[in-house]
């Protein structure tokens, strides 16, 4: 139940990010970045709480898990930054009218590169997690991450218009 509530909050936040990408009139790097950072901080705190409540970690497991979790989130944030840059580029191109073929191809390749990096990152963290958690808890954590990511991607996909 707690995971469902968190996913609803996450979905709301995911819908807000593309609207920041389409903000016009504000000087680059001002209000829109501040708003995105506020959303990120809220999401980070909520996500950590949900993970904590759904992992049932022993004290020894928690001692090993949280540093790996924090490193994973830092790396995930770097990927999110790349994706947000791609979304902003798409919003700029979309707002100008029909997106040129070369621009569409470039943006598509950037988005696919982020997906490739995300999978590579997930694979690189499994052995790190296996050093501090039993296999079932590693699988559970990766399921939680995957479910959250799927909801975010679904909401982003629903809020970003198709190329024309």
Predicted regions and their residues:
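Short, linear, compositionally biased motifs with a strong N-terminal bias
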Residues: 10-13
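Bacterial N-terminal signal peptides that target proteins for export
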Residues: 1-8
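Amphipathic alpha-helical segments
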Residues: 29, 36-37, 50-132
């Amino acid at each position: 139940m707690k995971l469902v509530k968190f996913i609803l909050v996450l979905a709301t936040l995911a819908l807000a990010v593309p609207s920041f990408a389409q903000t016009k009139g504000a000087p680059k790097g001002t209000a829109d970045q501040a708003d995105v950072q506020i959303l990120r901080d809220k999401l980070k705190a909520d996500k950590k709480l949900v993970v904590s409540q759904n992992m049932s970690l022993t004290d020894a497991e928690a001692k090993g898990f949280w540093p790996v979790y924090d490193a994973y989130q830092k790396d995930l944030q770097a990927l999110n930054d790349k994706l947000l840059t791609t979304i902003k580029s798409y919003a700029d191109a979309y707002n100008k009218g029909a997106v040129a073929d070369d621009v569409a191809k470039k943006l598509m390749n950037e988005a696919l590169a982020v997906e490739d990096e995300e999978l590579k990152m997930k694979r690189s963290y499994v052995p790190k997690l296996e050093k501090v958690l039993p296999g079932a808890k590693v699988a559970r954590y990766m399921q939680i991450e995957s479910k959250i990511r799927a909801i975010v991607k679904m909401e982003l996909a629903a809020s970003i218009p198709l190329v024309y």
